[in-house]
Amino acid sequence: MPEINTDHLDKQQVQLLAEMCILIDENDNKIGAETKKNCHLNENIEKGLLHRAFSVFLFNTENKLLLQQRSDAKITFPGCFTNTCCSHPLSNPGELEENDALGVRRAAQRRLKAELGIPLEEVPPEEINYLTRIHYKAQSDGIWGEHEIDYILFVRKNVTLNPDPNEIKSFCYVSKEELKELLKKAANGEIKITPWFQIIAETFLFKWWDNLNHLNQFVDHEKIHRM
């Protein structure tokens, strides 16, 4: 694996690069484990290294979507606006559990607490709904990028927020119209959004949002959407 100098990067974020992500093939079958660092180096991504991830979309009881702006300390896509929470299940027994995507849902609960300070009891795994998966690849800069099969997870609940400033620069709840304005600003270069959020917003999100009371029709655990 290539050696990359991380001396100039945020120390807290560099520590997280040692976490072990779940390596998968293109059909989401586990084939091993590798550090977060190696999973996010473009040099490895170009050789086909692929890992499991998730994206949470949390809506409050007014059907507004919680967005976050990634902190400037983040190694990939710093300062970008994105969906509620995006991260990776780790290669440990609890988060490797594939039955009903329980491991991924446990990981989502863990990261909602770590990033947004949402108490664990407010988002138990059984209230995190797994819709489908998308497979995408994107570069953050010349060194770092993403190559993931991303589990799409929906939560509908009012929650307590206490964000970690090392993870999150800002957050807001948005209506559909407000998100459309945000996407226009991104298209005009006024703000930055993450590529996975842009992909999901342009393809699936508004259709799902229109049917928050009837999401079962969109549940598809067989197909992996190649983006």
Curated annotation (Swiss-Prot):
What are the Nudix hydrolase domain coordinates in residue numbering? 49-199
Q: Report keywords, A-Z.
A: Acetylation, Cholesterol biosynthesis, Cholesterol metabolism, Isomerase, Isoprene biosynthesis, Lipid biosynthesis, Lipid metabolism, Magnesium, Metal-binding, Peroxisome, Steroid biosynthesis, Steroid metabolism, Sterol biosynthesis, Sterol metabolism
Q: Give the pathway annotation.
A: Isoprenoid biosynthesis; dimethylallyl diphosphate biosynthesis; dimethylallyl diphosphate from isopentenyl diphosphate: step 1/1
Q: Which residues carry this modification: N6-acetyllysine?
A: K176
Q: What's a GO cellular component annotated to this UniProt protein?
A: peroxisome
Q: Name one GO molecular function term.
A: metal ion binding
- Class of this enzyme: isomerase
- Sequence positions that bind substrate: K36, R70, K74, S87
Q: So what does this thing catalyse?
A: isopentenyl diphosphate = dimethylallyl diphosphate
Residue sites binding Mg(2+) per the record: H40, H51, E146, E148
Could you tell me the Gene Ontology terms of the biological process aspect for this record? cholesterol biosynthetic process; dimethylallyl diphosphate biosynthetic process; isopentenyl diphosphate biosynthetic process
What residues form the catalytic site here? C86, E148
UniProt similarity note: Belongs to the IPP isomerase type 1 family.
Any idea what job this protein has?
Catalyzes the 1,3-allylic rearrangement of the homoallylic substrate isopentenyl (IPP) to its highly electrophilic allylic isomer, dimethylallyl diphosphate (DMAPP).
Output the PANTHER family linked to this UniProt entry.
Answer: ISOPENTENYL-DIPHOSPHATE DELTA-ISOMERASE, ISOPENTENYL-DIPHOSPHATE DELTA-ISOMERASE 1
Q: How does it assemble?
A: Monomer.
Protein name, UniProt field:
Isopentenyl-diphosphate Delta-isomerase 1
Q: Which organism is it from?
A: Macaca fascicularis (Crab-eating macaque)
Q: Which gene encodes it?
A: IDI1
